[in-house]
Amino acid sequence: MFNKHSVEIDWGGRPLRLETGKVARQADGAVVATYGETVVLATVVAAKTPREGVDFLPLTVDYQEKTYAAGRIPGGYFKREGRPTEKETLVSRLIDRPIRPLFADGWRNETQVIVTVLSHDMENDPDILALVASSAALTLSGAPFKGPIGAARVGFINDEYVLNPVLDEMPETQLDLVVAGTSDAVLMVESEAKELSEEIMLGAVMFGHRHFQPVIDAIIALAEKAAKEPRELTVIDDSAIEKEMLGLVEQELRAAYAIAVKQERYAAVGKVKEKAIAHFFPEGQEPKYDKLRIAGVFKELEAKIVRWNILDTGKRIDGRDSKTVRSIIAEAGVLPRAHGSALFTRGETQALVVTTLGTGEDEQYVDSLAGTYKETFLLHYNFPPYSVGETGRLGGTKRREIGHGKLAWRAIRPVLPPHHEFPYTIRVVSEITESNGSSSMASVCGASLALMDAGVPLKRPTAGIAMGLILEGERFAVLSDILGDEDHLGDMDFKVAGTEQGVTSLQMDIKIAGITEEIMKVALGQAKDGRIHILGEMSKALDRARAELGEHAPRIETFKIPTDKIREVIGTGGKVIREIVEKTGAKVNIEDDGTVKVASSDGESIKAAIKWIKSIASDPEVGEIYEGTVVKVMEFGAFVNFFGAKDGLVHISQLAAGRVQKTSDVVKEGDKVKVKLLGFDDRGKTRLSMKVVDQDTGEDLEAKQKAEAKAEDEAPAQAAGE
């Protein structure tokens, strides 16, 4: 019944198994991949006919994690998986980026890749396995895919590269880098690093590339057993159309791309395009070509003209040379009520970035396959349509916004102070108000400034820069701080963020084969120069964190109480803690280890809450004097609340010097009194005294009398000695 085929290799000290022919047999390609005890199913289905009216590759990638993979049931009312989580969205993009450039030009068939996590062993992150399984399924599917690709995760522990570190090793690593590519070339890099050098980063990329070669060989071996016949793809020769169009509009198109201002340039290019379309579709005549085809040729011509111009003259669209960064204006503290804010403008790209500080109540609970954890640093990126002069629908967060936000998050996280030193929940929001290239890196720069403006003690300021590449044969140009057009028309999008000490994040997407290690080395070196320049421009606005937190930010004080006192501080059903919060106005968070965080924008509220909590969590000391309130008057004495929630008895004989006939002659309920703790009776009840304390000054009269008596005893002896 099953026509099963499989291959198995040892990879990074663990078995990797790829199997097809048993599960999801009606898909064009289906592979069950197992690494350790983590299992994923990758399927590929491509439509039989091209999609009408599109001039792009209609590819969708969906990665989904099933909670049963970790032996868990989903939360919520419906008890089933809902919309994609952030992790699922990010891994979907991670798979999409290296496979998209490998589809044959002209492939317009709707293609869907679905990857499902079936089992998770809590050791091997499924993302790498998902990439490998997707590559294998595509290679088997018959779709025109110029793969296969391999992928690997690279760590850096104790100054050594580690292949596919397990989840328990991740807290120790200085690097979390994912690299994917073919046997000849690197196509995609995604990473977070703790201020590592460019040499270490490049070494990690090449280490990963070398170590996923056995995976590519395994996929090829599986394809030799089970691959479907390749689909036919008719490639249309448009060289004659391009030659005719080039003669018609070349000079005008070159002139349009010499206009530095983006909107003016777009308008000029639009007019040239209208001229080309009018030429190929004369009124009253039967058109010889499809309009979409002519538009596609025009797009190709645009790319060639921009690329030729850069390689031939060294000048870019806006007149810069390959290494120059656009003019930068950095401002901090631009919003009066925000805890921290910055406006970062680089050319026609602008980000308004705002930092908000919160407490433990604001932490984000993340439900993942590995379990639930709390996230204390959030970075959200918003890209409204007005930022590129367009109209559009506002609504849910798009995949691109999630991806760009995570890239900036990775760049900033390594320079944040440890949570035990700065116990705030931090949310950074980047509003892209203008965009013409590398808005994610503008978000990094703006986030660094906004955090420092809020008083967050970053290790060092952080900046980011986007690099591009034009490669034609042996000639190439690495471009610093690319424009949007250079991103679309170039061969590489290479984003690097970091401090003056090293790289904190690297993301690379390469659209073609042939990018050598030497080219990547040049790009990293040029990116470092650009990053240092940007940091210098940012320092004109703010070069270090402000000494004080933002005026409107909450203050947090942290201290510890004995764990056996937590229940008393919280009270039955939270009664005590609610009373503390209501009466002091401070927020209180108590952790299982006894760590208490008290937060408020009012310092007096914090002091009052701390005093209250400490009075509950600690024990009164015998012989100490305390202020208290009479809470109950009895015939035999008065009960006084004197130490947080603790009450004690002042016996009628301890109310005042001399004989007291009635307790009410001395005190009444609500009176503020000063008492001394005498001790505890045989039943553990607290014994207090008022008569040994001066009710005006709080002085210990008993101690005073003893001191005076001692002085009198010593006086005759001193006189005799004289």
UniProtKB/Swiss-Prot annotation:
Required cofactor(s): Mg(2+)
KH domain: residues covered: 554-613
Superkingdom per UniProt: Bacteria
Region span, Disordered: 691-722
Main location: cytoplasm
NCBIfam families: polynuc_phos (TIGR03591), PRK11824.1 (NF008805)
Domain S1 motif: 623-691
Catalytic activity: RNA(n+1) + phosphate = RNA(n) + a ribonucleoside 5'-diphosphate
Pfam families listed in its UniProt record: KH_1 (PF00013), PNPase (PF03726), RNase_PH (PF01138), RNase_PH_C (PF03725), S1 (PF00575)
InterPro entries registered for this protein in UniProt: ExoRNase_PH_dom1, ExoRNase_PH_dom2, ExoRNase_PH_dom2_sf, KH_dom, KH_dom_type_1, KH_dom_type_1_sf, NA-bd_OB-fold, PNPase
Bias (Basic and acidic residues) ranges: 701-713
Coiled coil: none
GO annotations of cellular component type: cytosol
Family label: Belongs to the polyribonucleotide nucleotidyltransferase family.
Broad class of enzyme this protein falls into: transferase
Keyword Nucleotidyltransferase: yes
Protein task: Involved in mRNA degradation. Catalyzes the phosphorolysis of single-stranded polyribonucleotides processively in the 3'- to 5'-direction.
Organism: Rhodopseudomonas palustris (strain BisB5)
EC number: 2.7.7.8
Binding site for Mg(2+): 487, 493
Keywords: Cytoplasm, Magnesium, Metal-binding, Nucleotidyltransferase, RNA-binding, Transferase
Gene: pnp
Location relative to the cell: Cytoplasm
Gene Ontology biological-process entries: mRNA catabolic process; RNA processing
SUPFAM superfamilies named in the record: Eukaryotic type KH-domain (KH-domain type I), Nucleic acid-binding proteins, Polynucleotide phosphorylase/guanosine pentaphosphate synthase (PNPase/GPSI), domain 3, Ribonuclease PH domain 2-like, Ribosomal protein S5 domain 2-like
Protein name: Polyribonucleotide nucleotidyltransferase
HAMAP family hit by this protein: PNPase
